[in-house]
């Protein structure tokens, strides 16, 4: 028998009266933290040492969330955001804080979470890897928004915590040549007869040119292709189309893959070049990626003929430089397409001391052909971390473990596994891969002591 209940009003979502709060610190997502009636209050947009007027938007038993109404007393770290879209676009969330303040916060947050969960309090950080604060991204994916009423197509990014597309005319963290293409591309796409069926637009700046990948849901006619080809020639950019099956087709020219170099770019004999398809993952900050790889080589110190395992190796960002320095490298990656690209890159660089495998690194690894004694281990996992992979340390017994992390929480959790297995944290440093955002990347070096 069906029973019907009248839904209770959700009072937890109602706005409170305006409150004046003092902000103490930032949380790991870049929101200000204040106290109110025994609860922690999270306030996006607020900074430490500020007095702010807010309204509570959500109340739970132990915490609340608030909307920033006004800053009554400013922090000396507060600055005017440079991007006109900052308050609506969901891409950046710390443009209101000075770059030096952002980095101090990220280093403090990294130390705090490692001390809290990995018991590493009292340690000092290695110098942070830092670079340009603006126009550092070599890659971005722009969403399309087609208005059925006006028949107009807009390009933009998603709003924070939303699927809504915010139309933009520029991006202050995207490489300047790519940012300058946003308005011309929007104008071009509105001239296409297929504009209602276009998907996202990906822009890429590589060492061998600028690229645009346009997602299409149906084949374009000859007139649309001619317009794209003319645009590509005018703006000196490679354009390729990606269809529903994920296949890529060059517009006007043969398909060209973007390429970037690592190690010494001035001495070609020491450099390695990596090509990638638009579907492959690459680090978006070219300057910091080069510094990160160089630091990894310095910290791990690969020697000729050492057996080094590179887990979550991608298309060879670390594997190729390790092999270039003489090590016998085994790379393992969970995405088959990236394993294929890693093999292509190894062959293109004439590196034969490299073997790549495709496999699920969260599964039972005991019977994998590459499992066994190694000299050193490099890990570069996704945000979920490498907890499952580290359960097999006893079979691998590396003297050194270099962990490159894009999530301090999973790094701290995984560090406990290493510490329990007899490893000691020797070095820890911030990698500021994403200025103007709360995202924290880090590099940690562990050495076996038992």
From Swiss-Prot:
E.C. code: 2.1.1.190
UniProt keywords, alphabetically: 4Fe-4S, Iron, Iron-sulfur, Metal-binding, Methyltransferase, rRNA processing, S-adenosyl-L-methionine, Transferase
Highest taxon in the source lineage: Bacteria
Binding site for [4Fe-4S] cluster: 83, 89, 92, 171
Molecular function in Gene Ontology: 4 iron, 4 sulfur cluster binding; iron ion binding; RNA binding; rRNA (uridine-C5-)-methyltransferase activity
Family matches, as Pfam families: TRAM, tRNA_U5-meth_tr
GO terms for biological process, alphabetical: rRNA base methylation
Record-listed S-adenosyl-L-methionine binding positions: 283, 312, 317, 333, 360, 380
Signal peptide extent: none
Catalysed reactions, semicolon-separated: uridine(1939) in 23S rRNA + S-adenosyl-L-methionine = 5-methyluridine(1939) in 23S rRNA + S-adenosyl-L-homocysteine + H(+)
Boundaries of every TRAM domain copy: 12-70
Location of the active site: 406 (nucleophile)
Similarity section: Belongs to the class I-like SAM-binding methyltransferase superfamily. RNA M5U methyltransferase family. RlmD subfamily.
PANTHER family assigned: 23S RRNA (URACIL(1939)-C(5))-METHYLTRANSFERASE RLMD, RNA M5U METHYLTRANSFERASE
Summary of the function given for this chain in its UniProt record: Catalyzes the formation of 5-methyl-uridine at position 1939 (m5U1939) in 23S rRNA.
Designated name of the protein: 23S rRNA (uracil(1939)-C(5))-methyltransferase RlmD
Species, as recorded: Shewanella putrefaciens (strain CN-32 / ATCC BAA-453)
Species classification: Bacteria, Pseudomonadati, Pseudomonadota, Gammaproteobacteria, Alteromonadales
Gene from which the chain derives: rlmD
């Amino acid at each position: 028998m069906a029973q019907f209940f009248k839904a209770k009003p959700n009072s937890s979502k109602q706005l409170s009266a305006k409150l004046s709060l003092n902000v103490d610190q930032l949380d790991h997502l870049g929101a200000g933290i204040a106290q109110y009636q025994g609860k922690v209050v999270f306030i996006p947009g607020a900074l430490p040492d500020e007095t702010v007027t807010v309204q509570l938007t959500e109340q739970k038993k132990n915490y609340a969330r608030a909307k920033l109404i006004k800053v009554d007393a400013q922090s000396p770290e507060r600055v005017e955001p440079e991007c006109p879209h900052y308050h609506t676009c969901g891409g950046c969330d710390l443009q209101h804080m000075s770059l030096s303040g952002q980095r101090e916060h990220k280093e403090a947050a990294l130390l705090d979470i490692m001390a809290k969960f990995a018991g590493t309090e009292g340690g000092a950080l290695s110098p942070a890897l830092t670079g340009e604060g603006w126009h550092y991204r070599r890659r971005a994916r722009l969403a399309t928004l087609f208005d059925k009423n006006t028949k107009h197509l807009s390009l933009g990014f998603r709003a924070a915590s939303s699927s809504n597309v915010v139309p933009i005319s520029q991006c202050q963290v995207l490489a300047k040549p790519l940012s300058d293409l946003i308005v011309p591309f929007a104008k071009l796409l509105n001239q296409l007869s297929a504009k209602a069926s276009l998907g996202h637009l990906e822009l890429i700046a590589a060492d061998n040119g600028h690229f645009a990948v346009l997602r299409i849901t149906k084949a374009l006619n000859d007139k649309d292709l001619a317009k794209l080809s003319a645009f590509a020639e005018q703006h000196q950019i490679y354009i390729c189309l990606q269809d529903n099956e994920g296949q890529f087709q060059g517009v006007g020219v043969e398909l060209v893959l973007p390429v970037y170099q690592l190690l010494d770019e001035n001495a070609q004999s020491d450099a390695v070049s990596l090509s990638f398809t638009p579907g492959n993952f690459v680090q978006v900050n070219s300057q910091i990626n080069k510094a990160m790889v160089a630091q990894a080589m310095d910290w791990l110190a690969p020697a000729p003929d050492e057996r080094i395992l590179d887990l979550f190796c991608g298309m060879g960002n670390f594997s190729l430089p390790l092999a270039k320095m003489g090590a016998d490298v085994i790379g393992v990656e969970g995405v088959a397409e990236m394993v294929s690209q890693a093999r292509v890159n190894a062959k293109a660089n004439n590196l034969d001391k490299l073997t790549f495998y495709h496999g699920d690194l969260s599964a039972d690894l005991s019977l994998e052909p590459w499992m066994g004694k190694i000299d050193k281990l490099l890990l570069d996992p996704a945000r979920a971390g490498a907890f499952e992979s580290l359960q097999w340390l006893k079979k691998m017994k590396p003297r050194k473990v270099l962990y490159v992390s894009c999530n301090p929480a999973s790094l701290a959790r995984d560090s406990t596994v290493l510490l329990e297995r007899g490893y000691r944290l020797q070095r820890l440093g911030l990698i500021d891969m994403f200025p103007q955002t709360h995202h924290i990347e880090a590099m940690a070096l562990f050495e076996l002591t038992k």
